[in-house]
Amino acid sequence: MNQALQNNTDKNIVLLKKRALYYLGKREYSRNELLQKIGPFAESLEITRQQVDQTLSELEEKDWLSDKRFVDQFVFSKKKKFGLKKMGYELKMRGVDEIIIHDALNKIKSEEYDLAKNI
C-alpha cells in the first residue's frame, strides 16, 4: 500500500515537472511566477510545498529556470517602454531577488551612459 502511494506521488511530481517545462517552453519565468503558475496544479495533485520547491530547485540546477535569464529578457523587452524605476518595481512584484534586479538595472545605466557619451 505504501509503495503504491509513493509511486502515485512520483507520477504526480513528473506531471508537475512536465507542466513547469511546458510553461518554460513558452517564455522565461521567475521562480516566483512559475510557483504561482503551477501552485494550483500541485495542490490538485496533493503535492506538498516542499516537493514543489524541490522540483523548482531541480529545474534551476539544470538551468531550465533562471531568475537572471528572466530579468535579462524582461529588461530587453521593456527598456524602451519603461524607465528604470518602473522596471525595478515590476521585477520586485514578480518576486525577483533584489541583487539580480540591481545588477540588471546598473547594466542598463552603464549602457545608456556609454551611448550618450559616444554621441
Can you name each region flagged by the protein language model?
Residues 1-119:
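An alpha-helical, amphipathic repeat domain used for nucleic-acid recognition
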